[in-house]
Amino acid sequence: MAKFDLKDDSVVVVIGSGAGGGTLGSQLAQHGIRTVIMEAGGRHEIEDFANDEWGMFGKISWLDKRTTSGNWRVAKDFSGLPAWIVKAVGGSTIHWAGASLRFQEHEWKVRTHYGNIPGANLLDWPIDANEMAPWYAKAEDNLGVTRTNGIPGLPGNNNFKIMKAGADKLGYKECHTGRMAINSEPRHGRGSCQQLGFCFQGCKTGAKWSTLYVDIPI
């Protein structure tokens, strides 16, 4: 492991190795900038993941109550349960669902679109869809987002098929399995989704994009 002088201002220090920190640190390093990524949690490899909800929750979650504020909780039956934040290399890219949607046109300019709504502080973004389009495209290629860059969509499970039948009957013009950062076919050395259903516990096939093994592999 490389060592750096604490007074060396040429070294970039990135806090966290999730979607933001892991991606930024990887890009900086690949462009020749000496970079250190600091991560509070340990490193788990794909073979460490298990199809066990509670087992993996205990292994990868950050259970420190200081990570949340206030007394609101998602579930009343586990009132002391903090927000689900992963404390490990890869951060929440280990347990995210993989949904990768672009902002719709009106979402960039919500103040203009919806007007001045009493009690709400809506603001327009200083950027728009056209400006972000090439960056979206670059991210979608790196993440392997389905239905972009010629990548086919994921197959629908039985639940989806029932929902789609209803959507078709109601006249919906578009209903599909979404744009997901999960390989629908082998790509860049990683396999395709096996429909195991344990995306939140870490992808055992590596089909789902995570900074853990895509951007900061050993």
Regions found by a protein language model. Give the residues of each.
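N-terminal glycine-rich phosphate/pyrophosphate-binding loop and immediately adjacent elements
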Residues: 2-116, 121-130
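Conserved redox-cofactor binding core of oxidoreductases
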Residues: 75-76, 104-107, 112-218
